[in-house]
Amino acid sequence: MKRLRTPSSSDSSDNESPSTSFSSNKYGSKPGTPASAQKKPAEVFRKDLISAMKLPDSHHISSEDYYLLADTWKQEWEKGVQVLASPDTIPQPSVRIITEKPKEVLFSKPRKYIQCWSQDSTETGYVNIKELAEAMCRYDLDDMDLYWLQQLNAELGMMGDGVVDELTMERVMEALERQCHENMNHAIETEEGLGIEYDEDVICDVCRSPDSEEGNDMVFCDKCNICVHQACYGIVKVPDGNWLCRTCVLGITPQCLLCPKTGGAMKATRAGTKWAHVSCALWIPEVSIACPERMEPITKVSHIPPSRWSLICSLCKLKTGACIQCSVKNCTIPFHVTCAFEHSLEMKTILDEGDEVKFKSYCLKHSKPKAGEPGLSPARHKPPTETDKLSLRAQKLQELEEEFYTYVHPEEVAHDLSLPLHLLDFIFQYWKMKRKSNFNKALLPPKEDEENLLLQPQEDSIHTRMRMFMHLRQDLERVRNLCYMVSRREKLKLSQSKAQEQIFNLHVKLVNQELSAGLPVSSSIENLLFHPPPRITLKLKMPKVQLGNGKSSSKSGNGPLCPDNSCNLYDTSEGGIGQGKPQLHLGRQRIEERINGILPASIYIRRDGGTPPLAVKQSGKPLALHAALHGQSSNGKTKNEAEKSRQIKSNGILDKPILQRDTSCLAASEKDPRSEISGKSQSSGFHKTSLEHFSRSLKEATVSLVRTEDLRTFEKNSRKSSGFSKPLSTERPQGGGRASQESDGYCPDAELSDSEPEAKGKCRQGGRTQNQRGDYVKSASRAKHSYGSRTSVQR
């Protein structure tokens, strides 16, 4: 033995375990222990045997005399060979024979779970299930049978014969039914075979030829009754018994790949998943058959061009499969091969000199038979239809069923059951009469059908379970859709609730700010919770350019941004030159207040020259902005409440006009809304443009704009005031007072009400332009007196 490494001796390589060249303790000895008390080793390995087999690399011998160790991954051979540590103390085995214990039976076979399928029972107490099933009678007597049996026994007693028990009659009825069923099936098969095999017009389903020769006989399928030649269908050897075609062997009825017909002599493709008629494969030029001897499989279907697949048959008018065309030159009428056979078109098979077969097909126009052409009799052009064949077959079957009793031999039944012939004849006549009364139907189902019914529930259960799983999956899909819709609806509801919560928190915050500022609460929390907040439309109009006749160029309207006279929250006259507020459009809530008879808050005049506090209904306007525009505090609230009872009388008419005692501030008198309900036409002309003060923070930003716009606004308002005050006062305003430059806001044009055209029709506007604040204040005072007088006059 030779290794691929440096030469080593046994001393250098045997250093991992004790060697046999010296006697030593494997585990060593404790200090102080005498040498005679040393323990013997438990295991002994000899490495000298391995070392003796090693050869140094310098040893020159032939390669055939040693083995080369090339695997150095796990060197187990370095450990040596284990030998006996104490060969003198080998234990000797001692053996003795003991008596065999009896076996305990731990399992007992229950008889009801054990079935014996053999013919003869092997153990006592066991029975054969098949024998029991065969011994059981399948026919059960009904009430009519029992009554007839009693009458028969009475007659037999009078005749001196023995009585017939119920079991004997049941066995006789079963034997008659079984023999009738077997003989009728054989007769039906024989009749069908005779009707096909001995038919003179029967032809091969492939070549359409009625002739046969020795070695190429015509074979009939025992299930579908097709007739083919041996060579046409590839039958190498005709079987002795029944013969079935390929489709009947598999029990399928596939559709042809090349035509729309089903049934007939068909063969499968190479994959075995698609089928085609052998005749279609022969007549279509692109398709071929791989093995001509067996005429299968059908190949090269993919070589059919798309133009052939797109042809429409001229006979069946279908675009299914591949069509062939007429062989006449310049005639391209397409038709299926099977359709041509059904319509008896001329289909020729020509054998050339080079043993090549050519197929010639002709359309309906070119396949007219010539005079004296053999093989084309009128009967061949009008073959019996499938309906005629089925009706003839049904007629034969009906004749067989009507003569069912002729297929029963009572002598054989009496011999098999060991019964007297005259006794069995009674039962036979009764059986015939009972079956006749049942429209010649069998009294027992065939035994084969019962065996199939035993397997049918299992198949039905599989289909039922598959159908159940399909419906279950559909139901689960519906549940999934419903769950998705419910979750989506709940998410939308959650988002809506969060939005309502945010709106409520904002309203609470604004109410708290209003209460802390000392302002009256404009709306209740309940209205905010149960009613949607009104739509806020903020309309800021700049003064319009006046026309030459002194009228405004803009027209009043009823749009969403144009306030209506019946929907004004409150109406005030000008509080000063260029002072005003934006209009808030809230028609729907104002109409509801008018219908419910709620009085709008009156506008009171403060004597200290400040802006009069306004009691505002729910307008949808942010209260913080409302407070900022007013710039008011809660110190003027008590004075206004004290004067409220004096302004409004029970009949809805002001007691007296409210006069202005301080010329630095003007307040407009507001007409009672109850007077508006009683007379809308009277109140429509007395609405003035509602104006409010802006906060002081807006004064400096708008002072330059107000200087130019106050003059136009003052002229318009002065003409309105002079028009109302003409019937009662002829006093002309005089110059004096402060200039209009002290205005602290701008004034929108006065045309913010739908009632202005009506007011213009009643009152003619006039007067001179007043440029000073004092004159404007006097004019406004006269206007207020005019309102009061006009109201009283019109009432």
Curated annotation (Swiss-Prot):
<dbReference type="InterPro" id="IPR011011">
    <property type="entry name" value="Znf_FYVE_PHD"/>
</dbReference>
<dbReference type="InterPro" id="IPR019786">
    <property type="entry name" value="Zinc_finger_PHD-type_CS"/>
</dbReference>
<comment type="similarity">
    <text>Belongs to the JADE family.</text>
</comment>
<dbReference type="GO" id="GO:0006357">
    <property type="term" value="P:regulation of transcription by RNA polymerase II"/>
</dbReference>
<keyword id="KW-0863">Zinc-finger</keyword>
<feature type="region of interest" description="Disordered">
    <location>
        <begin position="667"/>
        <end position="687"/>
    </location>
</feature>
<dbReference type="InterPro" id="IPR050701">
    <property type="entry name" value="Histone_Mod_Regulator"/>
</dbReference>
<dbReference type="InterPro" id="IPR019542">
    <property type="entry name" value="Enhancer_polycomb-like_N"/>
</dbReference>
<dbReference type="Pfam" id="PF10513">
    <property type="entry name" value="EPL1"/>
</dbReference>
<feature type="region of interest" description="Disordered">
    <location>
        <begin position="630"/>
        <end position="654"/>
    </location>
</feature>
<feature type="compositionally biased region" description="Polar residues">
    <location>
        <begin position="678"/>
        <end position="687"/>
    </location>
</feature>
<keyword id="KW-0862">Zinc</keyword>
<feature type="zinc finger region" description="PHD-type 2">
    <location>
        <begin position="311"/>
        <end position="367"/>
    </location>
</feature>
<feature type="region of interest" description="Disordered">
    <location>
        <begin position="1"/>
        <end position="41"/>
    </location>
</feature>
<feature type="zinc finger region" description="C2HC pre-PHD-type">
    <location>
        <begin position="253"/>
        <end position="287"/>
    </location>
</feature>
<keyword id="KW-0677">Repeat</keyword>
<dbReference type="GO" id="GO:0000123">
    <property type="term" value="C:histone acetyltransferase complex"/>
</dbReference>
<feature type="region of interest" description="Disordered">
    <location>
        <begin position="714"/>
        <end position="795"/>
    </location>
</feature>
<dbReference type="GO" id="GO:0008270">
    <property type="term" value="F:zinc ion binding"/>
</dbReference>
<dbReference type="Pfam" id="PF13832">
    <property type="entry name" value="zf-HC5HC2H_2"/>
</dbReference>
<comment type="subunit">
    <text>Component of the HBO1 complex.</text>
</comment>
<dbReference type="InterPro" id="IPR013083">
    <property type="entry name" value="Znf_RING/FYVE/PHD"/>
</dbReference>
<dbReference type="InterPro" id="IPR039550">
    <property type="entry name" value="JADE3_PHD"/>
</dbReference>
<feature type="compositionally biased region" description="Low complexity">
    <location>
        <begin position="1"/>
        <end position="25"/>
    </location>
</feature>
<comment type="function">
    <text>Scaffold subunit of some HBO1 complexes, which have a histone H4 acetyltransferase activity.</text>
</comment>
<keyword id="KW-0479">Metal-binding</keyword>
<feature type="zinc finger region" description="PHD-type 1">
    <location>
        <begin position="201"/>
        <end position="251"/>
    </location>
</feature>
<dbReference type="InterPro" id="IPR019787">
    <property type="entry name" value="Znf_PHD-finger"/>
</dbReference>
<dbReference type="InterPro" id="IPR001965">
    <property type="entry name" value="Znf_PHD"/>
</dbReference>
<dbReference type="Pfam" id="PF13831">
    <property type="entry name" value="PHD_2"/>
</dbReference>
<feature type="compositionally biased region" description="Polar residues">
    <location>
        <begin position="720"/>
        <end position="732"/>
    </location>
</feature>
<dbReference type="InterPro" id="IPR034732">
    <property type="entry name" value="EPHD"/>
</dbReference>
<protein>
    <recommendedName>
        <fullName>Protein Jade-3</fullName>
    </recommendedName>
</protein>
